[in-house]
């Protein structure tokens, strides 16, 4: 991504909610990181549990794979703002609770707020 004569690092927000299929999130994070893309990560409590249960991925390992991990309860985090520069957001897996919240404009935590902002800013949101 080029802006005003300098190269800006590519950023993507990866969200994980509590649905089965955490291996997809794990693999996506690996591919993005290996491609030099800055990964900003947020997960619901259940999402973190599923990542650990299905993939054996601990917070220590996750911290080494992504640029930054955000607390799902901190609605004041950078990714909750439209001024946070990123290309897109992916929520994988996406639980029915998260999908229903997004479909009805309910942004009750950082995961759904970041997705809501992604849509508001006209960026791509992949579920």
Where do the language-model regions lie?
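A cross-family phosphate/adenosyl-ligand binding-site feature
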Residues: 2-126
């Amino acid at each position: 991504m080029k802006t005003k004569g300098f190269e800006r690092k590519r950023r993507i927000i990866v969200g994980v909610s509590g649905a089965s299929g955490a291996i997809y999130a794990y693999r996506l994070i690996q591919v993005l990181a290996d491609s030099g893309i800055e990964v900003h990560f947020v997960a619901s409590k259940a999402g973190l549990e599923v990542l650990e249960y299905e993939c054996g991925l601990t917070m220590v390992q996750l911290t080494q794979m992504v640029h930054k991990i955000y607390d799902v309860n901190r609605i004041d985090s950078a990714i909750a703002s439209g001024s946070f520069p990123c290309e897109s957001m992916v929520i994988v897996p996406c639980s029915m609770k998260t999908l229903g919240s997004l479909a009805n404009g309910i942004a009750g935590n950082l995961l759904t707020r970041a997705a809501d902002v992604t849509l508001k800013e006209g960026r791509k949101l992949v579920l």
